């Protein structure tokens, strides 16, 4: 095998590996839970990220009073980000794929802090402050 062919084959293998990792990450099921509203806070249990045998990086919280769900990412026991899952481009509900949220309507992509990674959206997602209190997460909706 010549050097040029070797480099080409290695590049293809790297791209394939990267693609497959993103595919498998996207196949992981999202955990969806119901939240409750109390005193202008969306409340979920702090242990919502844990299942019997697995740990989730994020949970999707639905609540009937909210038009869109909220995606809550856990970075540590005290650091969370809560993002309104409404695309800032034209208002479609976003889908979560690992560390990114994607708009099925026009392809906008946001990272797990709500920042635009790929347009057409040019405004970051609405985020909510999260505090930990008595084994609960309080997501301020104010």
Question: Positions of the model-derived regions?
Answer:
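N-terminal pre-ligand scaffold of iron-sulfur
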Residues: 27-88, 93-97, 124-142
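Structured, soluble extracytoplasmic/luminal domains of envelope-associated proteins
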Residues: 90-111
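Short cysteine/histidine-rich metal-coordination sites, predominantly Zn2+-binding motifs
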Residues: 101-107, 117-125
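Generic short alpha-helical hydrophobic face used as a protein-protein interaction/packing hotspot
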Residues: 10-11, 91, 107, 118
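Generic structural "secondary-structure junction" signal
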Residues: 96, 112, 118-119, 127
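N-terminal secretory signal peptides and thylakoid transit peptides that target proteins
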Residues: 1-25, 29-33
């Amino acid at each position: 095998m010549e050097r040029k062919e070797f480099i080409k084959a290695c590049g293809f293998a790297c791209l394939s590996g990267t693609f497959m990792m993103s595919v498998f990450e996207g196949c992981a099921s999202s955990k969806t839970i119901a939240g409750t509203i109390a005193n202008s806070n969306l409340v979920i249990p702090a242990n919502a990220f844990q299942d019997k045998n697995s740990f989730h990086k994020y949970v999707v919280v639905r609540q009937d009073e909210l038009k869109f769900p909220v995606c809550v990412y856990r970075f540590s026991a005290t650091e969370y980000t809560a993002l309104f899952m409404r695309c800032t481009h034209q208002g479609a509900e976003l889908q979560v794929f690992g560390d990114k949220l994607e708009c099925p309507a026009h392809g906008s992509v946001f990272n797990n802090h709500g920042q635009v990674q790929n347009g057409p959206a040019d405004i970051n997602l609405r985020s909510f402050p999260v505090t930990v209190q008595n084994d609960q997460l309080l997501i301020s909706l104010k």
